[in-house]
C-alpha cells in the first residue's frame, strides 16, 4: 500500500507547485493563453505566449498586481474594433512595453519602458484594434519596431 502513496503524493506536489507558479505571477488562472508571433521588418520571428484580455473585466484588470512576467509572455488586449485607446499603469508593479496594433496586425506605435504604478495616460495616437504588453525594454532588445507585424488569430 505504501508504494502507491509515494507516486500519488508526487503528483499532488507537482500539481500544487504548478498552480502556485501560475498564481505567483498574479495573472488570474481563468485568462486564456494563446500563441502569438511578431515578425520584424528584417524577417526575424519572435514567439510569445499571450494572455488574452478580451472581456471588459480582463481588460480593466490587465497586468495589475502582476509581479513577474517571463520574457516569452505578454498580454494581448482585444478591443474588438479599431478606436483610440488610452492605457495606464495603475497598480502595475512592472515596467512594460505597450505595442499598439491596428486591425491588420501592424504595430503602429510602441510606448517603451512604462513607469510602474503611474496614472499618466498612455494613448495609442491612432485607431488600433489591440495592445500587446511585454516586459519593459524587450521590444528594443528584440529589435521590434513600429511597422512590424503581429501574427495572431485576431488579425486574420
Predicted regions, residues:
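Sec/Tat signal peptide C-region and signal peptidase I cleavage site
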Residues: 21-23
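Positively charged n-region of N-terminal signal peptides that target proteins for export
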Residues: 1-4
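Compact, glycine-rich, soluble single-domain proteins
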Residues: 25-156
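Bacterial N-terminal signal peptides
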Residues: 8-19
Amino acid at each position: 500500500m505504501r508504494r502507491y502513496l509515494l507516486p500519488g503524493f508526487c503528483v499532488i506536489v507537482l500539481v500544487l507547485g504548478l498552480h502556485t507558479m501560475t498564481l505567483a505571477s498574479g495573472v488570474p488562472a481563468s485568462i486564456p493563453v494563446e500563441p502569438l508571433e511578431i515578425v520584424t521588418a528584417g524577417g526575424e520571428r519572435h514567439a510569445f505566449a499571450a494572455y488574452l484580455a478580451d472581456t471588459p473585466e480582463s481588460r480593466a484588470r490587465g497586468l495589475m498586481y502582476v509581479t513577474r512576467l517571463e520574457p516569452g509572455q505578454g498580454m494581448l488586449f482585444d478591443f474588438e474594433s479599431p478606436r483610440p485607446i488610452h492605457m495606464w499603469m495603475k497598480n502595475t508593479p512592472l515596467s512594460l512595453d505597450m505595442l499598439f496594433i491596428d486591425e491588420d496586425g501592424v504595430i503602429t506605435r510602441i510606448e517603451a519602458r512604462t513607469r510602474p504604478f503611474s496614472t499618466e495616460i498612455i494613448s495609442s495616437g491612432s485607431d488600433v484594434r489591440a495592445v500587446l504588453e511585454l516586459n519593459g525594454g524587450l521590444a528594443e532588445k528584440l529589435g521590434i519596431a513600429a511597422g512590424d507585424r503581429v501574427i495572431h488569430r485576431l488579425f486574420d
